[in-house]
Amino acid sequence: MVSSGMYKMDNGKPCLNNCFPAKSLLRLPEEGRGHWIVVRKGSMKKGAAKASTEGQESQKKVSFDTGLKKISRRDSQADVLGHILDRSFLLKHHSARKPSDLCTINVSGMKFSKAKEKDFKHFTSVIYINASENLLPLDVFHTFPVLKELELAFNGIKMVYVKYGDFKTLEFLDLSFNSLTEEAICDLGILPHLRVLLLTGNGLTSLPPNMAVKEQEASMTSLTSKKYILRFPALETLMLDDNKLSNPSCFASLAGLRRLKKLSLDQNKIVRIPYLQQIQLRDGSGDWVTEGPNPQKELQPQMWIFETPDEQPNYTVLPMKKDVDRTEVVFSSYPGFSTSETAKVCSLPPMFEILPVKSLKARNQTLAPPFPELRYLSLAYNKIAKEDAVLPAALFPSLCELVFHNNPLVAHTRGIPPLLKSFLQDRLGIRLVRKKLVKPKHHMLMPRKESRKVKTYIPKVPKHSLVPHHLNMITDSPPSSLMPEPEHSTEDTSHEALFANEGPEGPSLTHRAFVPMPPICSDSTVHSEAVSHQSHTAGLVSSEHPSDDDAKSTESIFLTQVNELPSSTAHRENLEAVNDQRRPSTAPRETKRTRRKQTATSLHNKYDGYEELLTVKPDPAFLEPKGIQKNAQALHRMLKQPLICRSSKPRLDTFQKPYVPKEKRAGRIPILPPRKTRAQLLDDILIRMRDPRNVTEAPLGTVLQRRAQQRLVNQKQYREAKRLLKEFRARYRQLVRSSLRTVFAASPPPRPPTRRALSAGQPKLGRFLEFMDEFCQEPTASDSKE
């Protein structure tokens, strides 16, 4: 064996390999000594031919000038060399050290046109590749050992070169928005584990008829026997939306896919679903029956023969008598149909070559339904306009959901069509979708940060007392039971001192506070106050922090409950009498005076403004309502309907608006003039025709204030305005003079003596006449010329 050594190639780069490979011990004798040289030269010639063709194409596209051909060729070569997908680029682009560390590859939009296939063998962990928006073919990626998902959208792929053994683990293939042909789709059928195939937007007008089955080539030993191989053995999802499929034969091409579960044919030109029925031929060769070798007869609709197997289906597809292009389903109960006959012959058009017998021979079956495992079929955005065009979907045994929204069938109607609802939905349980499903929006979940959580504890705000601070300072004094009553003079002096400290305007701003009026206390509060005066306890509760008992004791009363008030006052007087008996009888007169003052002040402070309620007598005709609800209702009724007697005296302190009665003005209906007859209308027209004068109306001020350039344009109009103004001045002067003469009763003497006499005798009238003469001056010569 020859050991490996260093050698240099034509480009000068060293390479660790054998310059002359070792001879194989199992080499065939037909090969000569220089066989490897011939193979090497042939590969070099093929590479040069490809490079020349690519250079010519790029040269034609870039420029048509002969002088720029060399520049364009250099640019194309540099561009190709710079956009080659290889091992070094993948490691650098994904920041990986070893090829085995890389699991996914994303090179979308990199404008790659070539790739080194040998470098991809080292990427033993790559299972997903996204190479969209490039110019790479499919066969470039066959050297990835464990590749499962491949996306090659927008790559301009037309043909596919795949061999047996390539893409052994590929399960997902996206070839959307390319330019695939029917042959390329057939070549994809040899992928053994392909489950999802996306062929969106490839401009397909039809599908290959042998898409599900491939006929194997006959060997040299057995020329008579034929074998068939299934294509797409593991395909479950097929997306053919956004194409140009219109022929119903596409269903016949796809019906042989035995494991297909989801089929999407959205945004095509499909008009109907054809009836699909398995057909078996008379002879066992697998070929269609023909009457002769004449090629013209092969183009005509062929005669298909139904053989009756052991298990006869309950329906049969027959051509319609009126329209040969359409078919109809005939069930076994149809009159004239007998299952005892050995064979049925019918002529169907070639486009309904439905489920050919080749697929049955591959699985050794005699009869198979169309789409045996299809569960989801989408026909949205097509041209289906009739209900019977969708009914053949009932022959698909595993169909669970049928989508047909945005079709003419449901564009102008509401609800599911009745025939489809009763036959497909109610009987077969197929879910029919006639409206586009709106996907719900994802719920936005805001992450909760523990740092933003409020953990501080805010203490409760204590309740403040209703009595202000300066009143607490005054009332903080020992109870009257512990110290003797002060004299009247001392009380006056204390009040005067307090008034002097606070000033005539009341307490200072720092001690002022909003003090609500205290409510009228009930007899319970009076009793509690009397008991508090009797208590000899030394501990007193401050006014700033009142106890709960004090807060509960301050309850309001209803003003209508006046029956208990006299008893409460009597009870209060009794308590005060008991307190007076306990006091020492040193000054009986002073105690009597203070007692009277206390009763007067207590009544005056508590019931200020409500003294009449203490002495009022109840109305004998008034029925006292029982219960708090009746009292509340009576009070609400009195407040809603108050009996107020307003005084007749006018209030002079307020501004009063005089009463002005409004007059109702009814609009007068205008009286239409009498309708003129046709003779009167003709007379008016003739009168207008006889009078050729054209009257032009224009404001006098605007005509006189125009500029010199505009005056030249309308010179006639300007002269007419000057003449009218001169005439107006003359008439106005004459009118003023005649009116003055009648007022002063003066004889009309000549003009100069009159002016002197008036100016001498009556100075005011003379000045007025001079003013009028100056105002009404005659136009000058320049104005008259103009």
Curated annotation (Swiss-Prot):
UniProt keywords (A-Z) are: Coiled coil, Cytoplasm, Leucine-rich repeat, Nucleus, Repeat
Does this entry carry the keyword Cytoplasm?
yes
| GO CC, one annotated term | nucleus
- The answer to whether UniProt assigns keyword Nucleus to this entry is yes
Q: Ranges of Basic and acidic residues compositional bias?
A: 570-583
- Biased composition of type Polar residues is found at 524-537, 554-569
| Coiled-coil region list | 714-738
Tell me where on the tree of life, at the top rank, the source sits. Answer: Eukaryota
Disulfide pairs here are: none
Per the record, the GO terms for biological process are: response to X-ray
Q: Which PANTHER family match?
A: X-RAY RADIATION RESISTANCE ASSOCIATED PROTEIN 1 XRRA1, X-RAY RADIATION RESISTANCE-ASSOCIATED PROTEIN 1
* Name used for this protein in its record: X-ray radiation resistance-associated protein 1
